[in-house]
Regions:
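RNA-binding accessory domains that recognize and position tRNA/RNA substrates
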Residues: 1-210, 214-215, 229
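Conserved small/polar residues in nucleotide/adenosyl-binding loops
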Residues: 328-330
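Short, Gly/Ser/Thr-enriched beta-strand-loop segments that form substrate-interacting elements
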Residues: 307-315
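Conserved beta-strand segments of alpha/beta enzyme cores
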Residues: 109, 199-201, 265, 290, ...
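Hydrophobic residues at beta-strand termini and immediately following loops
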Residues: 181, 203, 269, 313, ...
Length: 330
């Protein structure tokens, strides 16, 4: 390959030629897009993006650099990163590094100087699909062979890969004693729970219902996370056993696992919801709320049991954004 050049090859054969960005190497993942103009550091470190190559639709990325505070986990979680153009000289009083240096240091492969609008439209029209970025190999046949071996996101349990392996306490003070199940939990979610007077103990994804009952929390929180919710069988079974015994609140993957435990079904969205301005209608109040979202699967509204109420709807595609079963505090 030419010096500093890179290629993105999609599973359907579409290719994009650009420049290397970050670490020199090769990476495979599901190619998706995020429509946020800011928040790239949070996106890079969000465990929900495990095994995904993220495309930023905003054309200029890295303006305010990288700092030590705006992380959602202890490391970069994405498999790769795609942008139109990198900011070479970031400007912010908290900035400690450029985004390119940050990716290089953490050995994350990226590509820039491609038509990200065309890529986004291709994903929008054809759906999220696997792709490979390489700054080492430009042979299409070779890259295609590697790509065909990559698993589909359907049926993939990734929660166990990103979850904590040990129980730990996030906050020791608070009125409400909460057990948070870590399927890929973000730091900001833990901070928000703590800010709302919750004493939080974080448990691994494969924690059993017996362990939660023994801990005896006042409520159980099911976190966000990557992969197919239907593949997290251990999580679904754990929630089934807790239904009616403890108040349960789920977000993102946790919301989907909770819905599956209640008897609903989930399905893969064509290209997912990833951005910071998704309109969601609160069906109780009629108010439209602007939300930040990051998920590739959704709950099938038609599969909800009769006793489960749909409380929130995504107005972009009329998919489920919230459910409630008030009789057992769900």
């Amino acid at each position: 390959m030419k010096k500093n050049s890179a290629i993105l090859l999609l599973d359907d054969g579409r290719k994009f030629i650009g420049k290397s960005f970050g670490f020199i190497g090769e990476t495979i993942g599901e190619v998706c897009f995020n429509t946020g103009m800011t928040g790239y550091q949070e996106i890079l470190t969000d465990p929900s993006y495990c095994k995904q190559i993220v495309t930023m639709t905003s054309p200029h990325i890295g303006n305010y650099g990288i700092n030590e505070e705006d992380v959602e986990s202890k490391k970069i979680q994405v498999s790769g990163f795609i942008i139109k153009e990198e900011t070479l000289i970031p400007s912010n009083w908290r900035s400690a590094a450029s985004i390119g240096d940050y990716l290089t240091k953490n050995k994350i492969v990226g590509i820039q100087q491609i038509d990200t609008r065309a890529l986004t439209r291709h994903i929008r029209d054809n759906g999220a699909m696997n792709g490979i970025i390489s700054s080492l190999d430009s042979n299409i046949k070779s890259l295609s062979g590697k790509l065909k071996k990559a698993p589909s996101m359907n049926g993939l349990d990734l929660a166990k890969n990103v979850s904590t392996k040990k129980v730990y306490q996030w906050s020791s003070k608070g009125k409400y004693n909460v057990a948070a199940i870590d399927y890929g939990i973000k730091h900001n979610i833990l901070k928000l729970l703590a800010d709302n007077n919750c004493k939080i103990t974080v448990f691994p994804a494969k924690t059993t219902a017996e362990e939660i009952i023994e801990f005896n929390p006042q409520g159980v929180f099911l976190s966000n996370g990557p992969g197919d919710p239907a593949a997290v069988a251990y999580g679904i079974e754990m929630v089934k056993e807790l239904l009616g015994k403890k108040p349960i609140f789920g977000i993102c993957l946790g919301h989907q696992i909770l819905s599956l435990a209640l008897g609903a079904k989930t399905f893969k969205l064509k290209f997912g919801h990833r951005g910071i301005n998704h309109p969601v209608k609160n069906m109780n109040s009629g108010i439209v709320e602007i939300t930040s979202q990051n998920h590739g699967f959704a709950v099938d509204l038609n599969s909800l049991p009769k006793n489960v109420k749909s409380t929130h709807i995504n107005l972009n595609d009329n998919t489920s954004a919230g459910i409630e079963l008030s009789l057992i505090h769900i």
